[in-house]
Amino acid sequence: MRLDRFTSKFQIAISDAQSLALGRDHQYIEPVHLMVALLDQNGSPIRPLLTILNVDVTHLRSKLSEMLDRLPKVSGIGGDVQLSSAMGAMFNLCDKIAQKRQDAYISSEIFLLAAIEDRGPLGQLFKELGLTEQKVSQAIEQIRGGQKVNDQNAEELRQALEKFTIDLTERAEQGKLDPVIGRDDEIRRTIQVLQRRTKNNPVIIGEPGVGKTAIVEGLAQRIINNEVPEGLRGRRVLSLDMGALVAGAKYRGEFEERLKSVLNELSKEEGNIILFIDELHTMVGAGKGEGSMDAGNMLKPALARGELHCVGATTLDEYRQYIEKDPALERRFQKVLVDEPTVEDTIAILRGLKERYELHHHVEITDPAIVAAASLSHRYVSDRQLPDKAIDLIDEAASSIRMQIDSKPEALDKLERKIIQLKIEQQALSNEHDEASEKRLRSLNEELNEKEREFAELEEIWNAEKAALSGTQHIKAALEQARMDMEFARRAGDLSRMSELQYGRIPELEKQLDLATQAEMQEMTLLKNKVTDNEIAEVLSKQTGIPVSKMLEAEKEKLLRMEEVLHKRVIGQKEAVEVVANAIRRSRAGLSDPNKPIGSFLFLGPTGVGKTELCKTLANFMFDSEDAMVRIDMSEFMEKHSVARLVGAPPGYVGYEEGGYLTEAVRRKPYSVILLDEVEKAHPDVFNILLQVLDDGRLTDGQGRTVDFRNTVVIMTSNLGSSRIQENFAMLDYQGIKEQVMEVVTKHFRPEFLNRVDETVVFHPLGQDHIKSIAAIQLNRLANRMEEHGYPLEVSDKALELIAQVGFDPVYGARPLKRAIQQSIENPLAKSILAGSVLPDKKIQLIVNNDQIVAHQ
């Protein structure tokens, strides 16, 4: 008997039977071994056959195990296992049956047919189960669908639809699909195309996240509810699983063979099946090797003839990139465009999905949370589509609330840690016997008892609240199940069951839920069971970094005292500080224009007066870190072509994939301070790019993505007019300086650029008093740096006045002061520390001696 006459599945089963005999110390491979191997095989071809024949496979398997146990065992045979004479006779019988049926190969089901004719114990068992040759032959015909076994892989290609597709109508019947709200026009258009005689293949096109797959799920739900035209009633919607189709196709042509078997089975169904191909573009080029066809080309004939009812779904970009390049494939599909829903439509969709998410997370989702999710995601998440981004917010907010319920509340956790800490201290003190330790131990025991009592009370409250929450959850789950049962009864036409549920079980559960909810409504101290708009805002803030949550009292207080905080570091610039503070307050109060940046400012004035320092202080105030500022030195953008560095190189140029310096920074941190330093040094064309940012708060990068600047503060600094200030400094007051500077600025910048800037602020030149205050700030920083190295520093008033005098230069601002501190204080101190003349941990005083600042210890 040649092994290559068997199908590949049958060959694997024979190898498994050999292993089974070897493992059980049997000398011969009997038909029972092979039958067990066939039943245990992964993707067994025998199991579906026995299911059709109404055989209890588990009962059969246990009977076969008993037969194996009765076979004689021979120990120490050294791994020599042979085919028994019964097995040889069985194979010959299989060959005879295969020839009779005109099969080129012997398949697994032929062995079952031969086993029934067997006079041995296996044949006897099948007779007891009521199997006859006629019954098995009919079942084989049903499974094969009239096909002969002309290929070694024939068994793997059988029931291709079950293996390579997912039945959406079946899932809809089981209530596993989410409800589809709205989208009536798109579903109607899809049905309209499916009803055509030829080219009845809609392709649903839209941006990622607008609900393309949901439309097909909606179609499946309408089919099972009989809400479709006569022509589509009773149809099945099958989703093609491309992963299963490609997985394990090792040899050339195997993928095509699988796809062909799917198409053959579809054609046999004669239009009763609608095939849904999600990510349709994956079909173009799938399975393409040198000289072989791809899946897209194999689909074309069936699509054109109208044999295959196919619904595709893909994004706009991928449709253009893959489908439109193949006009022959494109003309076979009819486009159904799906737009992003409006905020109002999204709210309706979320209300429909609300119950599913409540049931999954075991929390309650309030209506304000739904409205907030739709409106906030629409405003602040610009690079994704509704309703997907709004559903994400609801899902994550519900998940965070659930996590708080399941894990210990923060108050309880802190108390537990404190008790552990006190117990460790108690253990350490119990070994000490001096008076102080005993006194401390007594007070510690009192504190520990107090904390443990507090912990016990809180834990009791927590457990009671958890129990209350889980009670409502069980009722909600039962109510959902009752509603699903009612839907099944409606479809089955079981009126008595429907009335029992509608007028008995469901109202009773709703009443129970009301009572449980009222009990739960009593103010909970530890747990929250509701997703409100606050939770949605918190999740959005974590995702994007944009503060949209309601302000706490501390933050309101901080914003009202913003000028005070900024003035601690920025000296003598009242107007500039006020302008910036007002812009931030407008934004946080929600009054700023939603289509423009939070604020855009042009800071002008002489060098060294605090223009850049104000930006750093603002970033520090808003984000507690100066690094949160996106700083771009415009002196690097002097050439015309360097503009591309800001938004990214255009296609075809080197660096296209990398993205722009400015756009990438803002995409990662949508809420930030952008500082364009020394803006007048840049090429004039750079300002053309800034026009869109300042006016509409948006910019398109080199890859065509729109970057949102609406949550940024744009600050530009410039030294324009500083030469005039130097020339006329002694003669002019602040108003005169401002006029001179503005004259130069209006000549240099275009009017459309200046007109778009919210505020143009000219900084004051610094006076002697300002320099003294700045000197105090600078010396304080120096003292902090020295403190870290163990050298405490104290500066006398005279030393402060002297350094302020030395560092004062009305033209150059505060920068000469920095140099003066370096030369007069830092350099001598560094020498003293290295020489060892000043000692660590001993105060160093800076005093004035002969108009010189000296360090004294």
Curated annotation (Swiss-Prot):
Residue numbers spanned by region NBD1: 159-340
Positions with a binding annotation for ATP 2: 605-612
Amino-acid positions noted as binding ATP 1 in the UniProt annotation, renumbered to this chain: 206-213
SMART domains: AAA, ClpB_D2-small
Region (C-terminal): 766-857
Location of region: Linker: 341-545
Compartment list: Cytoplasm
Lineage: superkingdom: Bacteria
GO molecular function: ATP binding; ATP hydrolysis activity
Major location category of this protein: cytoplasm
GO biological process, one term: protein refolding
UniProt domain Clp R: residue ranges: 3-146
UniProt entry keywords in alphabetical sequence: ATP-binding, Chaperone, Coiled coil, Cytoplasm, Nucleotide-binding, Repeat, Stress response
A Pfam family reported for this protein in Swiss-Prot or TrEMBL: AAA
Keyword Cytoplasm: yes
Recorded GO CC terms: cytoplasm
Ranges in a coiled coil: 391-525
Region Repeat 2, residue ranges: 83-146
PANTHER family referenced in this protein's UniProt entry, alphabetically: ATP-DEPENDENT CLP PROTEASE, HEAT SHOCK PROTEIN 104
Domain notes: The Clp repeat (R) domain probably functions as a substrate-discriminating domain, recruiting aggregated proteins to the ClpB hexamer and/or stabilizing bound proteins. The NBD2 domain is responsible for oligomerization, whereas the NBD1 domain stabilizes the hexamer probably in an ATP-dependent manner. The movement of the coiled-coil domain is essential for ClpB ability to rescue proteins from an aggregated state, probably by pulling apart large aggregated proteins, which are bound between the coiled-coils motifs of adjacent ClpB subunits in the functional hexamer.
Protein name: Chaperone protein ClpB
Species the sequence originates in: Vibrio vulnificus (strain CMCP6)
